[in-house]
Structures are given as structure tokens and as C-alpha cells.
Amino acid sequence: MADFLYRALERGLSALKKREYRLDRSIPLSLLVGTVLRRFAWLVRGAVKCLVLQRRIGFVFMAPNVNLRNASLIRFGKGVTLERGVIIDGLSRDGIEFGENVMIGPYSVIRAGMLSNLGAGVRMGANCSLDAYSYIGAAGPVTIGDNVIMGQHIAFHAENHDYERVDIPIKHQGTRRKGIVIEDDCWVGSNTTFLDGAHVGRGCVIAAGSLVRGEFPPYSIVVGAPARVLRSRLTTEALHSQAVATGGHPG
């Protein structure tokens, strides 16, 4: 019986995530059932939220105390999970969009501007995760590719204040907004901050505690505050593996 339940759950999760998914058999069955029931309650809560908002936002898991503001400007792919206490404010020019199977961790906040100075918005690709207590300020456009994993306490600040004049307060001098881009398949360590204008290439690893601004080439290992390239991931072995995976030939 237990093996049947494990296999049934694996089939369902594999279909949802569109890849093979295997459960750790060391998880006690009672805990696994409890997790499934909790996720089902989150799914029901998401469906009820859709009805209240009179929106069809798909197959979304919502933990308690999720706050969706200006929800008509928020778009969800299938299988998105919003953990406890998440706040998302869709007020923006381009809206806030999540791909399939995105996870937003507990007490994270995503917003894009204010009534007097509308921000651009956020586009987060499929299979991304943003862990607990993170913040995305998308006054400028924030674009995150597919399969990006991010730790706790991640911050995006896609805006800079002008401060050249000293005769008026900084808050009244205006802002500049270049935006922030993280390409596909990146891993971002905890307590990393992205400043306006940051562009991180595909396959980069960002060390915990980094302060990221400027451009970084694909497959870089990036460390420090301010961040710098420590080395490239493109070793001879990695290039060979990539060539085999794509059916090519190593150079």
C-alpha cells in the first residue's frame, strides 16, 4: 500500500513538474500524507482566491496570509506556490508574470512602484524559486529566466535615485531605471543584492552575500561586494559534457 501511494504521488508530481520526480523513500508515510493534505488545502485556498478576485489564474498553491494587490495585473503559470505571508502588488506598467512551477518563499514581497511613479514590472520564468524574506522592487523591469534558484534574503533594486543637486531633497530629484536581468539556469546564494543595471548571464553562480551590479558573462562564478568574476565554469570537462549533451563535438 505504501509503495502504491509513493508511486502515485511520483506520477502526479512528474506530470505537474514536466520532469521525472522521485520521492525520498526515507520520508515516513504519515509525514508524506500530512504534506499532501497541506498542499491540497493550499490549492483549495488558491481556487477560492481566484473566485473572490473573479479571475482564472490557474493551478496555484496559496499558503495562509498571502496578499495579492491589484491582482488583475498578476499572471500565474500552472503549479505556482506562494508560501505564507507573501505580498505581491501587481500595480505596474507591464504587470507581474510567473511561469510554471515557480515557488515564492515565506514573507517575500514583490512590487513595482507607486501611484505617482508607476514601475515597469516583473517577468519570472518557469521552474524558479525565490526563498524566504526576499524582496523584488521592480521600478525598472526585472527579468528572471527559467530554472533560476535563489536563496533567502535576496533583494532586487531596479532603480537609482539622482542626488547631484544639494538645494533640494534627494527624494525630489527623480530616478533612473535600467532594469535587472538574470538569464536561465543561475544559482543565487542567500543575502545577495542586485542593483539597477545588473545583467547576469546564463548559468552563473552568485556567491552568498554578493552585491551585484554591471554585466557578468555566462557561466561565471561571481563573488564579493562589489561582485567580481572569480572564474568561469567552462572548464574543459564542462565543455566536453555540454558538447555530448547537445550532440556536438568538443573543440
Q: What do these predicted regions represent?
A:
Residues A158-V166:
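Short acidic/His/Gly/Ser-rich catalytic and metal-binding motifs that mark active-site loops
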Residues P28, I168-P169:
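Short, structural beta-strand-to-alpha-helix junction motif
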Residues M1-H157, E183-D184, T192, R202, ...:
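Domain-scale signature associated with acetyltransferase and cell-envelope carbohydrate enzymes
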Residues R165, K171, S220-I221, T235-A238:
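Short, glycine/charged-enriched secondary-structure capping and boundary segments
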Residues P169-I180:
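A short acidic, glycine-rich active-site loop
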